[in-house]
């Protein structure tokens, strides 16, 4: 055992002998960050995200969509939901990343294309929004109209 390893062990034993870190209740487990509920599936988390989004609780929605993509990284709809929740919070760069991942997984995903284009408009990137509109038009005329209107308002 190296000298460094022995020092770490001695330091750890010293902390334990003193009752643990200052103020810590060593009879209770340390708190952990919120995580996916036991037995929860990606679909469960996606649906949780949709409910939070419908309630306009975008922070909770983003957390649920993050759990969904952690459970199933290829879940394009969850990446899109994450992008939407982030965009609603004004987190545009993160939102773009989520939309790009959704579109990497499902290149002809009309909803993700519309929302990506709307995010570009929010960022003032109208040329990128127009290129996105060009991709969207043959896929979904209604969504293309909505994006076109957003671009026109963004001028």
Question: Model-derived features: where do they sit?
Answer:
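Canonical tetratricopeptide repeat
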Residues: 81, 115, 149-150
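Terminal, low-structured helical/coil segments at or just beyond the last alpha-helical repeat
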Residues: 2-4, 10-11, 25-35, 126-155
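Helix-start (N-cap) detector for alpha-helical repeat units in TPR-like alpha-solenoids
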Residues: 42-43, 76-77, 110-111, 144-145
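Position-specific recognition of the canonical hydrophobic site in helix A of tetratricopeptide repeat
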Residues: 53, 80, 84-87, 104, ...
